[in-house]
């Protein structure tokens, strides 16, 4: 196969994109109400509850690890 035949498809890939214009073109995106207008309070509650739970668990685990470290090294 000739090298020019291989370069033809590549030149199409490297060419700048052209956007179709005219009244027949439809947008792929629809204008909708922003998601912040009506928050899903159930998701908000689960998210905040999970966050609080994870922070409490992290701090509790950290304190247990500190006590274990002190016990093993004779610092307590």
From Swiss-Prot:
Origin: domain of life: Eukaryota
Function: Accessory subunit of the mitochondrial membrane respiratory chain NADH dehydrogenase (Complex I), that is believed not to be involved in catalysis. Complex I functions in the transfer of electrons from NADH to the respiratory chain. The immediate electron acceptor for the enzyme is believed to be ubiquinone.
Transmembrane regions: 41-59
Membrane topology per record: Single-pass membrane protein
Family matches, as Pfam families: NADH_dh_m_C1 (PF15088)
GO cellular component: mitochondrial inner membrane; respiratory chain complex I
Keyword vocabulary terms for this entry: Electron transport, Membrane, Mitochondrion, Mitochondrion inner membrane, Respiratory chain, Transit peptide, Transmembrane, Transmembrane helix, Transport
Family: Belongs to the complex I NDUFC1 subunit family.
Oligomer and partners: Complex I is composed of 45 different subunits.
Protein name, entry field: NADH dehydrogenase [ubiquinone] 1 subunit C1, mitochondrial
Family annotation (InterPro entries): NDUFC1 (IPR026192)
Boundaries of the annotated transit peptide in chain numbering: 1-27
Subcellular location: Mitochondrion inner membrane
């Amino acid at each position: 196969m000739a090298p020019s035949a291989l370069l033809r498809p590549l030149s199409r890939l490297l060419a700048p994109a052209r956007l179709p214009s005219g009244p027949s073109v439809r947008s792929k995106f629809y204008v909708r109400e922003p998601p912040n207008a009506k928050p899903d309070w159930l998701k908000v509650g689960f998210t905040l509850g999970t966050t609080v739970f994870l922070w409490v668990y992290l701090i509790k685990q950290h304190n247990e690890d500190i006590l274990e470290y002190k016990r093993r090294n004779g610092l307590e």
